[in-house]
């Protein structure tokens, strides 16, 4: 059977950047576990804040965390109370000074993670999986997507045999490296067990910037 490579991992270094923008030699494993703990804490505390991407940067005794969210007001809280509480918890967790930057996602319907999260929540609310997928596809295409593909797998409608069923609209060129394809995988906890939700969104082409060479006229 043909297998698909991870669309984001394939494009890192071409049109996508790394989520963790740091490098270490001897402390690499410590920093990696620290990064995982930071991400887990943020995802737990901000489960309802539509956080799509968490980026980390490091300096000496300092960690810079950038949160991409569709609900910045919920992350910041009244007079910054929520973000201050989160910063204090991260400081305690890492033992370092943590800076938090918040970036608003202008079009959440073009973000694969948020679209997948929305479908998963609808499945948990017992909305039909076909309807949930088709509504998400319509919203993404209206928001300006060039193409979108969704797939829900598991015991659909409580069937004894698990299967996968998906829908697509437009084009999703997975082999084109310059194609800006966002991909996400989510889980929905239903009464019949877990359902997997996959979303691919094609947002158009991105041409890699040509790096100028010194002395080039």
Curated annotation (Swiss-Prot):
GO terms for biological process: translation. Keywords: Ribonucleoprotein, Ribosomal protein, RNA-binding, rRNA-binding. One of its GO terms (cellular component) is cytosolic small ribosomal subunit. GO terms for molecular function: mRNA binding; rRNA binding; structural constituent of ribosome. Residues 38-106 form the KH type-2 domain. The keyword Ribonucleoprotein applies. The keyword Lyase does not apply. PROSITE patterns: KH_TYPE_2, RIBOSOMAL_S3. It holds the Pfam family KH_2. InterPro entries: KH_dom (IPR004087), KH_dom-like_a/b (IPR015946), KH_dom_type_2 (IPR004044), KH_sf_prok-type (IPR009019), Ribosomal_S3_C_sf (IPR036419), Ribosomal_uS3_bac-typ (IPR005704), Ribosomal_uS3_C (IPR001351), Ribosomal_uS3_CS (IPR018280). Belongs to the universal ribosomal protein uS3 family. Binds the lower part of the 30S subunit head. Binds mRNA in the 70S ribosome, positioning it for translation. Part of the 30S ribosomal subunit. Forms a tight complex with proteins S10 and S14. HAMAP family: Ribosomal_uS3_B. This is Small ribosomal subunit protein uS3. The lineage of its organism: Bacteria, Bacillati, Bacillota, Bacilli, Lactobacillales. The gene is rpsC.
């Amino acid at each position: 059977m043909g297998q698909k490579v991870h669309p984001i991992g394939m494009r890192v270094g071409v049109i996508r950047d790394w989520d963790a923008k740091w490098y270490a030699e001897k402390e690499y494993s410590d920093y990696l576990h620290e990064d995982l703990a930071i991400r887990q804490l943020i995802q737990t505390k901000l489960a309802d804040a539509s956080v799509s991407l968490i980026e980390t940067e490091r300096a000496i005794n300092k960690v810079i965390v950038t949160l991409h969210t569709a609900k910045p007001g919920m992350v910041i809280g009244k007079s910054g109370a929520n973000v201050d509480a989160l910063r204090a918890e991260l400081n305690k967790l890492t033992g370092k000074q943590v800076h938090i930057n918040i970036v608003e996602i202008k079009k959440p319907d073009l973000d694969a993670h948020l679209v997948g999260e929305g479908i998963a929540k609808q499945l948990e609310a017992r909305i039909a999986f076909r309807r949930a997928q088709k509504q998400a596809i319509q919203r993404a295409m209206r928001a300006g997507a060039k193409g979108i593909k969704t797939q829900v797998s598991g015991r659909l409608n409580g069937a004894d045999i698990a299967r996968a069923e998906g829908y697509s609209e437009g084009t999703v060129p997975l082999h084109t490296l310059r194609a800006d394809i966002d991909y996400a995988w989510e889980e929905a906890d239903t009464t019949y067990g877990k359902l997997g939700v996959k979303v691919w969104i094609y947002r158009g082409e991105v041409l890699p910037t040509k790096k100028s060479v010194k002395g080039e006229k």
